[in-house]
């Protein structure tokens, strides 16, 4: 089962080259509480229970996949963790620009680099545009891979 968030925060089920609006299945989610539970995105947490409702809601002709705007795949991540130089080419690039990088000595060792937190609102979907708030400042592009730690994943 391939699910997605698309257009105006609609939950979709992708089948072949079409996306089916299965947002009705979200009605089965438990009501939010305060303080909010800290166990992650409610859809992901309750996915096993919602799966039959998601599959049953995939009716009609769907929307061609090319006509939807995909949003971030996780609507409510609990946290996003990063590391400054996370692959060999970036470490080599940083080593050539020591005046720019605060450590002055890029290292492949994670203990030297440390980790940092990003806002959980920093995620975007495929094809979405990153808006630079201060375009006159130096901005380094980053391409990231998200990993869910803690549960076996399926596609």
Where are these regions (language model features)?
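Non-heme Fe(II) oxygenase catalytic core, chiefly the N-lobe of the double-stranded beta-helix
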Residues: 119-155
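Metabolite-binding pocket within alpha/beta catalytic cores that recognizes anionic/polar moieties
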Residues: 116
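N-terminal non-catalytic cap/leader segment that marks the start of a structured domain
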Residues: 1-113, 136
């Amino acid at each position: 089962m391939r699910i997605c968030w698309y257009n105006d925060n609609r939950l979709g089920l992708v089948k072949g080259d079409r996306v089916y609006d299965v947002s009705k299945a979200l009605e089965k989610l438990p009501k939010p509480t305060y303080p909010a539970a800290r166990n992650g995105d409610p859809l992901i947490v309750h996915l096993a229970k919602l799966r039959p409702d998601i599959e049953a809601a995939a009716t009609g002709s769907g929307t061609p996949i090319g006509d939807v705007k995909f949003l971030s795949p996780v609507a409510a991540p609990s946290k996003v963790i990063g590391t400054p130089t996370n692959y060999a080419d970036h470490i080599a690039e940083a080593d050539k620009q020591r005046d720019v990088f605060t450590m002055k000595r890029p290292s492949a060792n994670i203990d030297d680099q440390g980790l940092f937190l990003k806002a959980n609102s920093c995620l975007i979907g495929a094809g979405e545009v990153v808006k630079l708030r201060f375009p006159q400042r130096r901005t380094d592009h980053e391409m990231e891979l998200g990993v869910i730690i803690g549960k076996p994943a399926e596609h």
